[in-house]
Amino acid sequence: ENTTPFNPRDAFGSHSDSDHVYNTPRAWYMQRFLNPYDEVWDGPDADHKPTSDDIPWARQPERKVTIEDIKYVLSSHYQGTPFDPYGQLGDERTRHMYRTIGINRQSQLAVMQIRPYRPQASRAIQWMAYGSNPFNTLVPFFPNVDTTPAYLEDTTTRVTSENFYWANRIIAALCDGAFRSTSNAVERYQEKTGAMGHRLVAATDE
């Protein structure tokens, strides 16, 4: 009896019209970023396009993935393509054609880092960001702790820059409508806090 290989995408996925706006383009961009040299991603002769129904179900990235890579992918808005709503490529039609991964309705992002080379008590780190991913920043938390600094530990009922959640919400509200003039400042904020997070983790490990 002839059989065909099991295809999990066909078995568990869908190919609806809404997928071609909300889901498939995001899978295309993630794989385009993590596997840029595996295939041709752009142009009329691209192996896969944003609406292709045969984008691989899973694939191994071309290099080891960092915390920053995960943050970039989950904050992405089709940078470097005509589909970026903040970009200058394409036109008004293409810039609003597909739903981005990073959107203003996001509330929080968590990235789990398991470090097998560390003792059990400090092996895991949970990197957390609050608010809209294109404008927020990741900070590291050790899960095996009893208390967290007040600035980080909750979401207050009062909007204030003295709370990490609301500080990132405020940044997004101020920068979303002025992306081109504020993106460099947001990127510096993300890089500085990320570097400080890695430095604090390294100091704690010592």
Where are these regions (language model features)?
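C-terminus-biased signal that marks the final domain/tail of proteins
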Residues: 1-206
